[in-house]
């Protein structure tokens, strides 16, 4: 998992409440057994005017010119600004995968659905919670100023505006540790590899028959 320490990025404002996971990545794209390839279909039914299907070349699609992520001023955005209850709906982990693979490193919103919130941390995506009034102010600024960027300093737990104003945010200590070090669940398990090897050796010594294979 990619480490998250300090990130400066262009902000894309998605001015919708209750954005659900089916909007983030529609169900027809969940058939893949791989964890990659979801970025091109992020917000698929909003980004395109035609219906999409798995394996389709995005270049052949008809983009919706009114959708925020299709507007030139937000091309390359890596910070998504959202309204309350972002990520509601079903518990599909594909939602943070799609956001990450599209290029987003962080989301800023007043609130999130619990499962989406937890899944985001586990996949290297930082979901920041700010008071609704502060989020509204960020929307005003992002819409008013083309090229609007923010710097997110996870170590200090602050969002820094271009003029230097800082907005503090909370993050649970263990989640912060994992993001700063790039540890997903597998990475955390591998930190205990010496203990795992010692346990396996001890188990083999006490129960050697467990290592035997059955002839076919």
From Swiss-Prot:
CDD domains in UniProt: IPMI_Swivel
Pathway: Amino-acid biosynthesis; L-leucine biosynthesis; L-leucine from 3-methyl-2-oxobutanoate: step 2/4
GO BP annotations listed: L-leucine biosynthetic process
Annotated S-S bridges: none
Catalytic activity from the UniProt record: (2R,3S)-3-isopropylmalate = (2S)-2-isopropylmalate
Lineage top rank: taxon: Bacteria
Keywords carried by this UniProt record: Amino-acid biosynthesis, Branched-chain amino acid biosynthesis, Leucine biosynthesis, Lyase
GO CC terms: 3-isopropylmalate dehydratase complex
Enzyme class: lyase
One GO molecular-function entry: 3-isopropylmalate dehydratase activity
EC number, as in UniProt: 4.2.1.33
Family: Belongs to the LeuD family. LeuD type 1 subfamily.
PANTHER family referenced in this protein's UniProt entry, alphabetically: 3-ISOPROPYLMALATE DEHYDRATASE SMALL SUBUNIT, 3-ISOPROPYLMALATE DEHYDRATASE SMALL SUBUNIT 2-RELATED-RELATED
Main function: Catalyzes the isomerization between 2-isopropylmalate and 3-isopropylmalate, via the formation of 2-isopropylmaleate.
Subunit structure, interactors included: Heterodimer of LeuC and LeuD.
Protein's UniProt name: 3-isopropylmalate dehydratase small subunit
Organism this protein belongs to: Polaromonas naphthalenivorans (strain CJ2)
Gene from which this protein is expressed: leuD
